[in-house]
């Protein structure tokens, strides 16, 4: 290409954008333009094109793109002359900006300016006595150039603002690698140019050479704020927005003296009261930043909050102006601003103790917050609920709350305690359509919202008990005397989506909150002189309330269930006064007859009755744990009553009542404990060694026969069902219903897992002494040791059931049926591709078809597996009974991980969801619950194989997800979720559980027990000794951890790197084999897969620190480590890098050197992002930048700030590096 390159580029662009060009011509032109960027003259052609085509945005933008490419990709290859020339071209183009230049042209011009500044500005300040030439190449007059640009015209002024905005974003908000390398110079320069020089001098020590980089003694704030005030007077909305865009980026980091001196807050409040929506939105963000940023000068903070509270009338009027009537439609302009407004207002409560109420400011503030709490949007209302809960927990706030808001807040909370998601046409659902992407999200939020509302009622009940009691009595009387209340009292079953049921449920929830408030009062008030007198009064009131509620003749099962749960709460306060009354009520409710309901069939009404009975069983057992001595007095009577009702109970209900008796036996001072224990427990445990059980567990086909699959197959044959039949379309007949009923009864007591789990679980509750624990071990040891092999064998068969290879000997129709039964049809918020209601509807329809057999068998398989896992977890709570048994580790691991001969496949067919349950329900509790005196025997036998299993399992499952996958997938509506997305989501959940297992073992905090920041518990400290001191355990642990770091899941990778960080000082330089693994596997993984991969950007800083520690440690000891890094870095001078790192003490400087190294590796290995700079790629990069900025801004304005940058903590970073690599 010759000197006419610019004209050739213009011609090529004409071809691309001409409607007359064909695809072949466009492709050829595009190929030419891609090659242009590789030419050394390309920046000059870009400058020429942009300069000579000022009104042609397409040509100008492409020309600027060539300059941008040159700065970003080739800057390090240019000598100082070329760099200065490039800078002058960029300045000339910026100085030539005009009104006709589009917004995106101005953004591109500003970006070019900033890209040059990030690479050169202030570089000479690293020298002690820089020369004039060095100052020139360091763009010493950039601040002056910006003032020149500011004064040209209105467009140049706007461009200057964009330059500042992008510069400050890159320096203070984004993790920009170019900035990170020059942070020690570029951050102080930014601070210096925005503030007066005497203010800068208070914080920073600097020499005269620094002042050469500053053009205006007063700084840019003194320019922007008067400019903003003038724009507000002229109502120049566009200019106001541009000024605020820049101001918003520089409120968190300048010295607070600048903020106060320029009265920034007053200008922001004026913006807030304007009628310019975008200005209001940005003003709210900016005020929020000012309220939550750190202040080194307390008086500056006080002045800021005083100014805000003095303007409560203004804030109130702003809120009123933002309100709209949602019945017609949601105002999508005002609604986001309302959310920001309330978010900002709700963070102000922390300032209340610092405010002197001279003009009713605090009253006005709480009244305003209460007004926002009443907002019909649950999101808006919900933003204030934590504020009320926090204030109600803090005695400092109570006098003001009692004075201004408590009665109104209590009334609101009671009225708001409803199931919004179940009320058709509720106004909150209009807002939910905007705020939530799926029904399940809305349902989850409603649950959280109700929890906060309940907390408010509970806390008010505690601090204003008499007021709440009178209010509650009045409310209950009014409700149950109303038509709805009368309907509730006269009905057996109610529609759970209509007002009579929902209204009554709300009343019972309020009663529950009140009782919990009374329970909290006992903890909160004991220091009062009149405590005993007040307590007697409260107990009297509770007894009256309890008797009134018992007198209500409820039969609706789910309302009765709620009433029973409330009675159990009454018992915690009233104890013996109401024990027998409530006990009678619970037993009566548990055995209440519903003659119109067939409990053998599945349906909403029969499910409700079962739910009631299950709840009664739980509350009985809680009663026994709470008051065993009181119940001991009537134990013979209880035995007789329960013996009489046993024949009428289901198997599950029988176990609940037996558990009730067992608790009284074990927890009271009742005599003949061993005999009574044996009489209750042994008949159930004998089923484990029953001949039919032993045979059923010995072979998978026998196991399937025990499940009833043979009978189902015979029934299918009689109905001519084959493997091609659609079970969901074939209705179940009378014979099928009879078979299903028979199997259901069999499945209840198929294996004694539920009885075993409940008996052990309740035995181990409320243990008060070591003697009691030893007594329980002695009772359980002779019973557990013989049956443990049967329990684990059951788990083995449950795992084997899912393997298709194990079905091969079965008839084809049976294979098809078993396959159906292994399909998991569960509903899980955020994971299922249907709403909960849709899932239930489909399940109910399936119950009338032959698919119900497959669903039911699948359910009993999963239910039995879950209870078997719970049994193992419960057994582990017996301590040495489980952990000191030689066979325990192998029995457990061999039952869950079945290896296919000749392959590494583990338990084929077991779903990701199933594995998550296995790890959560059994493995984690077993790992965390091991007593200290059992660790040395159990863990070396258990951990190596466990880590190997987890590593193989996750690597197999992640193998198909590791290419081109988003680290943070965009949330998708349930209806759009494919099976692949569902599986990926479940895999992330499983991986999270595995990361938690790793953290359970070795922790994530500082390993130094003397450190103030040590977050390791005693169990983790002991586990670390076992893992780190045994190579057989450490090797699979490190292999698993290294893989966890590389899986493309943001949280998983980040947390795994934190684990790796906290292990380094304990494992490096201890063993040559381990150091070799770190060299050839861990460092390679961190460098090439994490640090050079933008997908791991959230883990970058932690990974960089870990890599630096490993690098410095191993390069000091092993020449082979340096040679290997030289090889994989494509020839970087590793020896020089090591020397440079060792020559500096501060980690920030080490970090800059490492970033240079990573840049080299990325550029030489082709891992740099954006090598092809098409318009689409540019747009994607801009969208990515905006997304990162959005996250950064959210962190900036959130209420609870991080306590500084962890990397700035000398105890963590510099100190750790310094100590670790000390030569002495």
From Swiss-Prot:
GO terms for molecular function: nuclear export signal receptor activity; RNA binding. Coiled coil: none annotated. Gene3D superfamilies: Leucine-rich Repeat Variant. One of its GO terms (biological process) is tRNA re-export from nucleus. It comes from Saccharomyces cerevisiae (strain ATCC 204508 / S288c). Interacts with CEX1. InterPro entries: ARM-like, ARM-type_fold, Exportin-5_C, XPO1/5. Pfam families: Exportin-5. Present with 3500 molecules/cell in log phase SD medium. Residues 1200-1224 are annotated as: Disordered. This is Protein MSN5. One of its GO terms (cellular component) is RNA nuclear export complex. It comes from the Eukaryota.
